Amino acid sequence: MSSITIRGCCIGAGRPKVILPIVARTEDDILREARRLSALKADCIEWRADWFSDVLDAAARKRVLSGLRAALGEKLLLVTFRTKAEGGETSLTPQQYADFCGTVCVSGCADLLDVEFFPNQEELPALIGQAHKAGVAVVCSSHDFHKTPSRTEMVTRLTAMQQTGADLPKLAVMPNSPSDVLELLAATAEMAEQHPETPVITMSMGALGAVSRLCGETFGSAMTFANPGQASAPGQVALDVVNEVLDSLSLE
């Protein structure tokens, strides 16, 4: 599996990098949480902008992005607008989504931008090109909150995301049996072994899939989301547990 380095953080090599989400409604609460999370043992902070009550206000977006960058220092900042169709709080029109991504890219504050794969097929080349021109890495994401596709389908989806030019394909699926969790792990290992052009981020959601968030170094998932107090997705494990298990399972 290849790796990318951002702000000295090597994603795709060694211990999976830990991401902490910020899910807050107001500018003050977002920045207060950012200051709290900046002191914790994690590599990256994700701003879930779909939770922000003023997300349609471009000036408010810019203020939050600037405040986040100041609060986080050298921690990585991932900016995500998760649409309702992909498990988020709300949705935007295609133009609103493009405007949001544009604000993130030109702000100079974000290190990574999440771009959803399925809702944005036609716009993906332009969105990814804009991000790369601004020096922002792209996480291309896909979520299934109902089931786990076959291993073949998951690998096909991840390789399709690679082919968009995204830096980090991300796949999150819902297991309905232990075998589903194994399928996700097998697909992850296949990507690392047979399609190593980019690092990937994968997870099996819910309590049943929680183990997948802890064994990324073994199977090939480059980053994992931890719960710093309020989870942004089902099955996120508490930060102290994540760090303890990642250290225990380290291959180095």
What positions do the PLM features span?
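Short boundary motifs at domain starts and secondary-structure transition points
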Residues: 7-13
